[in-house]
Amino acid sequence: MRRQEPESPLVPSSPVALVVQKFGGTSVADPDRIKAVAEHIVATRRRGDEVVVVVSAMGKTTDELLRLAHEISAAPAARELDMLLTAGERISMALLCMAIIELGEPAVSFTGSQAGIVTDTTHTKAKILDIRADRLREALAAGNIAVVAGFQGVSTDSDVTTLGRGGSDTTAVALAAALGADACEIYTDVTGVFTADPRVVPQARRLSRISFDEMLEMAATGGRVLALRSVEFARNYGVRIHVRSSFTWEPGTWVVPDEELEVEGMEQPIISGVTHDTSEAKVTIVQVPDRPGVAARLFRALADEAINVDMIVQNVSSQGHTDISFTVPHADLARTLKVMEDHVDEIEAAGVTHDADVGRVSIVGAGMKSHPGVAATMFETLAAEGINIEMISTSTIRVSCVVAEADVNRAVAALHQAFDLESAS
């Protein structure tokens, strides 16, 4: 699969000293796509830029490796699972290097460990502690394109680790920060960040720019374009991200600091997008004694099991008791119910209920900070559609509602229309 390069350059015409490019699994799913990505990288290098590439495993390789692991063991040892899963990126990085060399440019591949990505000791969900990028700098200084396996590092105990969901995005942004890159380009199977999921709202519009804070909220509430941790890295270290498609030459979406938008004199829209997430379940602890310390004990027990709790709602107390509802990822539901059931008698609550058939719909926009009535418009829109709101949470630039899963797509479409996002400038 080869693409003809357009007359206009891929990025602004002025040379960039150093660019980090990340390519996901769909971009390198087969040899033809790997060759196309190699041409893309070589074109950037021949424009005069230094290039560091971060690559994911080919296609569904990681899923296939996970399937194999679970055929062997119902609960694979975490250390060995990390050893297995990192094989996927090692394959793609080596093949991509071969393709680049075949085009006449020098390239060197690095595992996460060889690239100096140091993590904590948490297998399958490791956090990056440090990046010792000396070998990458040496490779660049020698005129090489450096190709790094995403999603992996080495722990302080010298064990191979993986970074969890979205780990290759996080690898790319972290390397861009450590190397002082001028930009981090994230190549995906979509052309950028949209005002809603185009599969749900065909009229959804691609955003040319969005702030770090808005992107963080979108990533946290169901936007799948960028991993949440990668956006956190970008905001903390001021790394500008360009999200674009591997398959077209269309301009993508720049994710930039808030102040960059302000300097350019761009008035931020009230709402930038509508997101949705159907990967969570609602859990309710019924008739919890309303006294100090009870909620703390419940949520400490969940934290000790590394269960991430999202939205939390506590009903108004009645006769000394209250209901506490919260959401957790579907993958953690069984463990959550076990932890809560172990504590129900201890805290003298009546019981635990759950609903796995829910979804979250959110509106995100920096402009809502200075515009009253945004939440009211959201609630009125959902009411007009006959959609019941089960839970509500807010931040300064986001309002989220939990609704029945069957109503999620209808809610997204209605909110997108209510805030006129398809025609916003």
Language-model segments: residues:
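Nucleotide/pyrophosphate-binding catalytic subdomain
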Residues: M1-V231, T327, V402-A404, F419, ...
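Structured, non-catalytic alpha/beta "coupling" segments that mediate domain-domain communication
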Residues: C97, Y237-G238, H242-V243
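Acidic-aromatic/histidine active-site loop/patch
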Residues: A234
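Short hydrophobic alpha-helical runs that function as membrane-insertion/retention elements
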Residues: V52, A183-Y187, I241-V243, D310-M311, ...
